[in-house]
Amino acid sequence: SQVGMVLNLDKCIGCHTCSVTCKEGMEYAWFNNVESKLCEHCLNPACVATCPSGAIYKREEDGIVLIDQDKLCISGCPYKCIFCYPRIESGQPTVCSETCVGRYLGVLLYDADRIEEAASTEHETDLLYERQLDVFLDPNDPKVIEQAIKQGIPQNVIDAAQRSPVYKLALPLHPEYRAADAGELGSNGILPDVESLRMLSAGDTGPVIRSQTVEGVTDTRALEEVGLTEAQAQEMYRYLAIANYEDRFVVPSSHRIDAINITEVR
């Protein structure tokens, strides 16, 4: 299982609250410029593999990537965060998420055996989008639940994955979570412009094409093109516009005592 975060950049107003709370809450280095990005806590982090001293490691129970302060390793990313793991362990969201209106936290179940296959695609655009989705598992699938229990994943983590806003909305990719620059409209007047979404799928525009009309009449043509139902679109609206606290943050308390010490495995 992996704890994941989603940022809705449409709601970012540059208020600096995320950086201020990180500075005050973690007493950690911070930067003057608003940077709505953070350590990705990757499923297969390259920094862990390249650190010569083995000081960087990925936690087994929640997938958070940390640096062992008793060892020496220069982080390749100046924005390295610890994902507020003491708060995550107690079932609380990160401080930046709790003070930001556009952040969502939740649990994802994934198949670690598929990571190498997804990363080994010969060409960047060859099913990159589909391969990424194949890594993540449906938490409502009985077979997935059965296998997760066999792997020692606690029931409360499985329950959290089933209610996870990250699984429901972030995957597959939606333009509402775009990482492209805002402030410009394409020639067709659609925001975001399809051309701006190419970065989400290595240049392949097919998977990220979306359209929306607001005319007081339900137009399902765009939904049919992307394989969404009207109910799913309504659910997206609920999460993106009027979500409650418990909808945005679904973080199970940690079972760290049951987790394998991944530093020993490494």
Swiss-Prot record:
Alphabetized UniProt keyword annotations: 3Fe-4S, 4Fe-4S, Cell membrane, Cytoplasm, Electron transport, Iron, Iron-sulfur, Membrane, Metal-binding, Nitrate assimilation, Oxidoreductase, Repeat, Transport
Species of provenance: Bradyrhizobium sp
Entry's induction text: Induced by anaerobiosis, there is no significant expression in an aerobic environment. Expression is further induced in the presence of nitrate or nitrite.
Gene3D superfamilies cross-referenced by the UniProt entry: 3.30.70.20
Lineage summary: Bacteria, Pseudomonadati, Pseudomonadota, Alphaproteobacteria, Hyphomicrobiales
Cofactors demanded by this protein: [4Fe-4S] cluster; [3Fe-4S] cluster
Binding site for [4Fe-4S] cluster 3: 39, 42, 47, 77
Positions annotated to bind [3Fe-4S] cluster: 51, 73
Subcellular localization(s) per the UniProt record: Cell membrane; Cytoplasm
Identification of the protein by name: Respiratory nitrate reductase beta chain
Entry binding sites for [4Fe-4S] cluster 1: 12, 15, 18, 100
GO molecular function: 3 iron, 4 sulfur cluster binding; 4 iron, 4 sulfur cluster binding; electron transfer activity; metal ion binding; nitrate reductase (quinone) activity
Domain 4Fe-4S ferredoxin-type: 3-32, 30-61
